[in-house]
């Protein structure tokens, strides 16, 4: 997606391309950010064509064209009215309304967790259609996931940290004091021992104090929702870091040296493929940030076309499994077995 940020000295929005070449230049979408930091995303072909029709070639010579701010807002509102999204259960949402609701984690992981697909859903389907079916009704929350969630909150959404997390002044989760807190809250998702919390904050401090992290995330938005229809199915996503010209996902790891291997093991390539489609970006504009929980070292990983293509293949395989067991119901889950030969 092309990103244009309006400068204070600009009277209008200026694009660094001739009008005649605009459609090709903007084919992956355009995001326009005004001085008040309000952004206007034009992704659908109809919206981009509407922009093109109202753009003026610059008078100062070739190489640029411009459009008035009120025109941008008018086009945005009119084209967005037509965008609706239908979930797997048939519920239809206005896309803007849906994106706004996705900031609410209870909606994102609740209703959308059941009635929209995601990179996690595709990974589960590839591993086992039974695992996907179970994930719709039963939540699995390992200590690794809990720690990762805590680090994400503290690093990307620190305002939520104080309101969500409970720290019990014990070293172990098997203590009576910890169990009493879980009983009081009714769920352990945001309850941490002092030991767990302090270890996570060490990792967060190392990340936030890293000069490269500070530079790359300056002016970026965090935890930005995205939604689109891919191959006829609704897909949800959240960009951990939405920069001016890139998207990044933050991962935690216990061993940074093995991150490249783990990226394949945990199918991060599927996430890459889905995010590129949902947010309309090129794979070259996507990166993974990996923070080592033990050392505090930060790894930054770009991706290749091979990694993107691998994600596409897994994505298509996951959809095949989904259609077979949950749409066309060509086979019952109870008949699913894994066969092999030991030699």
Model-based region annotation:
Residues 8-10, 37, 234, 245:
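Glycine-centered tight beta-turn/hairpin loop motif at sheet-sheet or coil-to-beta transitions
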Residues 18, 218-219, 224-313:
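Mg2+/Mn2+-dependent nuclease catalytic core
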Residues 30-36, 47, 81-94, 261, ...:
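Metal-dependent nuclease catalytic regions and adjoining charged, substrate-binding loops involved
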Residues 79-236, 339-341:
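Metal-dependent nuclease catalytic cores that hydrolyze phosphodiester bonds in DNA/RNA
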Residues 20-22:
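Intrinsically disordered, low-complexity segments enriched in glycine and mixed charged residues
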Residues 2-10, 32:
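A short beta-strand micro-motif
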Residues 16, 137-145, 261-266:
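Short, charged/polar micro-motifs that form catalytic or ligand-binding hotspots
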Residues 27-77:
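Acidic, low-complexity, intrinsically disordered interaction modules
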């Amino acid at each position: 997606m092309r990103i244009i940020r309006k400068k204070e000295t600009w009277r209008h929005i200026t694009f660094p391309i001739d009008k005649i070449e605009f459609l090709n230049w903007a084919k992956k979408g355009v995001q326009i950010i005004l001085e008040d930091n309000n952004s206007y995303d034009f992704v659908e072909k109809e919206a981009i064509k509407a922009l093109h029709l109202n753009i003026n070639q610059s008078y100062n010579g070739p190489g640029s064209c411009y459009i008035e701010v009120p025109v941008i807002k008018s086009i945005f509102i009119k084209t967005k009215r037509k965008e609706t999204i239908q979930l797997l259960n048939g519920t239809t949402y206005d896309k803007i309304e849906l994106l706004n609701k996705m900031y609410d984690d209870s909606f994102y992981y609740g209703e959308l967790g059941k009635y929209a697909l995601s990179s996690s859903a595709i990974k589960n389907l590839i591993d086992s259609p039974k695992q996907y079916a179970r994930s719709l009704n039963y939540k699995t929350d390992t200590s690794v996931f809990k720690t990762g969630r805590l680090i994400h909150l503290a690093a990307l959404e620190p305002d939520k940290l104080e309101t969500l997390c409970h720290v019990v002044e014990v070293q172990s989760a098997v203590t009576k004091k910890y169990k009493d807190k879980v009983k009081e809250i009714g769920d352990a998702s945001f309850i941490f021992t002092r030991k767990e919390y302090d270890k996570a904050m060490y990792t967060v401090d190392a990340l936030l104090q890293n000069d490269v992290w500070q530079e790359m995330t300056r002016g970026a938005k965090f935890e930005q929702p995205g939604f689109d229809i891919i191959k006829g199915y609704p897909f949800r996503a959240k960009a951990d870091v939405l920069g001016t010209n890139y998207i990044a996902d933050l991962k935690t790891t216990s061993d940074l040296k093995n991150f490249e291997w783990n990226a394949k093991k945990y199918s991060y390539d599927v996430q890459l493929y889905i995010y590129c489609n949902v947010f309309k970006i090129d794979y070259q504009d996507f990166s993974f940030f990996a923070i080592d929980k033990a050392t505090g070292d930060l790894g930054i990983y770009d991706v290749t076309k091979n990694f993107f293509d691998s994600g596409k293949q897994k994505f298509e395989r996951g959809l095949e499994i989904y259609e077979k067991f949950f749409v066309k119901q060509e086979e019952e889950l109870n008949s699913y077995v894994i066969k092999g030969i030991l030699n």
